Amino acid sequence: MKQYFEKMDPLGKPLSAKQVESMRENCAKIEEIMKTIDAEVERIRNVGVPLQTLHDRGEMSVWERIEYLVDPGTFCPLHSIFDPENEESGSTGVVDGLARIRGKWCVLIGFNNKWMAGAWIAGQPDNNLRVTDIAKLLHLPLVWLVNCSGVKLPEQEKMYANRRGQGTCFFRHAELEQ
């Protein structure tokens, strides 16, 4: 097989100066967007009670638990800034992504215990379903890091009702366990 690739004709043509310049401009635009996203993720990481308050209670934040649990450098967050209901914190309180734990890939989901003690809030069921869908599609184990005070009671009608409510999350979890 190596000989085939050594003798193979080059594919395509060299990029023109205009294409190279366009590529550089696109990269610069993407870097600006990434800076904006990174700043928003950092803002969400700092929402809620000060980290020291959690430490004084003997707790770790969800971000610290993820860092402790996963193999270094493997956590790839997915929906940290997803907020379909415009929650006052600017997030659904869900931290999720792909990660490796002891060399095995998994889908990881946790609740931000710095904001309302990790309570379920509006928009969270949709985020949870996105995560369980990914685990199902990729045939990966789903790891929950739950430190949750329950449901924000004035918003419970937004949590359980309809086909994409939190009840569906429980059903999906039962499916994944089979």
Named regions from a protein language model:
Residues 1-178:
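Terminal-region recognition feature
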